[in-house]
A protein has these predicted regions:
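Compact, glycine/acidic-enriched structural inserts
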Residues: 105-164
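Short histidine-centered catalytic/ligand-binding loop motif
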Residues: 29-36, 116, 126-131, 191-195
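Active-site acidic/histidine clusters and adjacent loop/turn architecture
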Residues: 14-67
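Short, flexible loop/turn elements at secondary-structure junctions
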Residues: 69-71, 90-92, 107, 116, ...
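A short, structural micro-pattern
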Residues: 80-82, 97, 106-110, 172-174
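Long, solvent-exposed, polar/charged low-complexity segments
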Residues: 1-15, 38-44, 151-199
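Structured soluble/peripheral alpha/beta segments that form catalytic or ligand/cofactor-binding pockets
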Residues: 100
Length: 199
């Protein structure tokens, strides 16, 4: 059961940023396990259980990121990630090309929401065709999003607009990838079991 992250979690992430090398990590591996790895896995398990209870007709696939970077893709970075996250999606076979719920913690902040990590061009073309065929469901969602202040629409835009369905839907229509994100500074919620319910 998730009981909250701690100041030690944030301290570990900052220290890792400045000491991103194997000897330092091995010396601090127990700190990683106690303050970041186990709490992240507990939070992911609790959120998964809540989703399974709320939507028993769906199969949820949980992925908790590993701290280790892919050695083939270091590109001058250290061997360890300075942020950790988990994702939950309904279809594991299509990987990052379908939307997922996510939570991420970094040395600076934490975020959660739903969206694409990466979407194929034809996936977004299907999304635009769905908007063209029936804009009302997305119009209702866009209006609800604009009426609240927790989540914002983010994601990379296409260099050239793909069309203009009107001012309300234009930001959605012209995204290369999109997500609805809540980004927060490290606050009391992060250090509390109540984070599970917030997610």
């Amino acid at each position: 059961m998730f009981t909250g992250f701690s100041d030690a979690t944030i301290d570990f992430l900052w220290e890792l940023r400045f000491h991103n090398e194997r000897p330092w990590f091995l010396e601090h591996k127990q700190v990683f396990l106690d303050t970041l790895d186990r709490p992240m896995k507990a939070l992911a398990a609790d959120v998964t259980a809540a989703l399974e209870q709320a939507h028993p007709d769906r199969k949820w696939y949980l992925h908790v990121a590993r701290i280790y970077r892919d050695a083939r893709r270091l590109h001058g970075n250290g061997p360890y990630k300075e942020n950790l996250w988990f994702t939950l999606r309904c279809d594991s076979s299509r990987g990052p090309e379908i939307p997922a719920f996510y939570f991420e913690i970094t040395p600076h902040n934490y975020s959660y929401g739903m969206g694409f990590y990466w979407a194929k061009a034809n996936t977004m073309a299907c999304f635009r065709r769905a908007i063209d065929a029936d804009p009302l469901p997305l119009t209702a969602l866009a209006e609800r999003l604009n009426a609240q202040d927790t989540f914002v629409l983010t994601g990379q835009d296409y260099a050239r607009a793909k069309g203009d369905p009107g001012a309300l839907l234009r930001p959605w229509y012209n995204k290369r990838v999109l997500d609805l994100s809540c980004v927060r500074e490290h606050d009391d919620l992060l250090f509390s079991p109540a984070l599970t319910d917030a997610l």
